């Protein structure tokens, strides 16, 4: 509806006018998450935190300062990854939810939208129940063990240097040994291939 906006999360960081589309919106949906690492994360972190005024700029107009209350929902076959931000702040702002693989025997329901529309009152009650729980938890989401595992796996997957250092075929830690950085770098580049 009017309170939502469809956009690429990558565009929020790479296009200076993109944040203007999020003004007065409650949710932004990226329905096909680009697997390219985000070059920056400053805008996304500021929007998610919703405590800092941001520069909202429209083409051919004076930029203004404003608060954006939008929340991001990103769907994809991978995780949101930052090229240069490995801070806790980037990761702690994410809740990673996985879904079951599609059953090969599943038959798609062509009437799913109609059936869900009929269930709107029940879905609304379900959402209000979740809102009451969120308020009772002082605006802290309940994070499932699976979501914690998903986040830990995403963090490990994005940290290839640690993975390299744990690759025993390339790196061995023994007392009283040393190696030249050029040899270590060659081993790292070979491991990356």
Which residues does each predicted region cover?
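Feature primarily recognizes SF3-like P-loop helicase cores of small DNA viruses
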Residues: 1-193
């Amino acid at each position: 509806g009017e309170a939502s906006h469809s956009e690429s999360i990558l565009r929020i960081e790479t296009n200076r006018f993109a944040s203007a589309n999020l003004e007065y919106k409650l949710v932004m949906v990226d329905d096909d998450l680009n697997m390219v690492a985000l070059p920056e994360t400053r805008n996304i972190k500021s929007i998610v935190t919703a405590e800092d005024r941001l520069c909202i700029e429209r083409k051919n107009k004076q930029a203004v300062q404003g608060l954006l209350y939008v929340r991001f929902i990103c769907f994809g076959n991978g995780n949101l990854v930052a090229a240069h931000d490995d801070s806790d702040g980037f990761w702690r702002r994410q809740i990673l939810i996985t879904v079951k693989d599609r059953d090969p025997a599943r038959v798609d329901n062509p009437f799913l939208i109609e059936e869900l529309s009929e269930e709107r009152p029940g879905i609304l009650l379900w959402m209000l129940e979740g809102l009451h729980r969120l308020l009772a938890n002082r605006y802290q989401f309940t994070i499932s063990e699976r979501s914690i595992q998903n986040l830990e796996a995403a963090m490990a997957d994005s940290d290839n240097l640690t993975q390299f250092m744990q690759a025993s075929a390339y790196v061995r830690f023994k007392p009283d040994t040393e190696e030249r950085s050029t040899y270590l770098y060659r081993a790292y580049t070979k491991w990356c291939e």
